[in-house]
């Protein structure tokens, strides 16, 4: 009897040792079934953290987004920390909002991600439609100057407004603009204070060094989508989950190699371009050559090459290619270049200040940058030839919108589209060959020439992403960050090549992984 008891106890303890002693749960509140809005909740033993907190793109702002009409679909105060894969808005755009919505923890990222966010926040915060603020301004403006609107509690200028002249309103910036009849510009001190407050909440981790965060060992590994971009490895016990973030590509002039992912139990991988192929290096080089030729041809004819692009990384890649085109003789070396976005200019300067951020040292383009002009007037600068860089890349915001009525109607202008164009945007209409586009409620005839290029994409194609997954053929693979067609095509391709352990992530579904 005693032998049987001992045998039973031994078997019980052995089984208990092999059994799971906990679980990691993953729920996607954004980035599932859509491009953008990336936001995944990772939980274990009562510890709750987010991987990314991004803004959604496109027209679908309902079921699959992290956004909801009342804010977040989870309690921000319940989140212990937030990990950020990189600084693009679709992965980090809601950081200011969640910071003001009850979240009290730290943001974790690489140093370049933190530093790039600090550069893009000033322009984002001015018109951030997701954040409700207590706005304060004076009814009286000295000397007819534009009134400044304040919102930060520590702003000394807001404190100097007399009770008689003090005006206030609570709501988003759009609601404020609809409420007042005068022009209000953002207080610089409030902007700087809010950026400093956000930066102070960041903790940074070096690449490839495990960091203890709650019950997890978290490792940031470079994926070279933009400077600082990381795949995030989350390990507990013997289990490891990987979140790819956005994977880079050899198509970028600034990237040489991307190391494959390490083996993991589960991989959540982006599927932006589905199972599509870029055509290989020769096709990409031919596309770059076509871009340089088109820009050079336009300038030599006395026309304007207009390149709308995202302020963060896309403008910098385009600028570097323009400088290379001038060095090769494809583009006139004396062509005037205009870069209107202060954010894009600040990021460009940061690239020069930190050559270690990229695989390629771009400081050869610094002389061109020093003569680049920050202002552009269509009536003065279209004639004679030149190159214009503006935001936004989809031409639905920033300087691009204001310039469309003058430039889209001018046959001397060639629009060079270098990024994704969401349906409903002016950029999408131009790329689709529209004869008219809608700008501010007006129909504008299109007389400009329009070209489109895919070589500037920061995302890897199917073959590149397969190579990144090479060590994970036996892993569970989950597809995120893609539209329905791209996700379906990507799943089919991966099942054919990797096996049947591939699934498309559903929004709000709880995925559980036992911890051993």
Give a label for each model feature.
Residues 21-77, 196-256, 379-381, 387, ...:
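Core dinuclear metal-dependent hydrolase active-site scaffold
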Residues 1-9:
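Bacterial N-terminal signal peptides that target proteins for export
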Residues 284-288, 365-377, 393-396, 431-436, ...:
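A general structural motif
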Residues 51-54, 79-88, 92-95, 107-110, ...:
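Active-site neighborhood of phospho(di)ester-bond hydrolases with catalytic His/Asp-centered motifs
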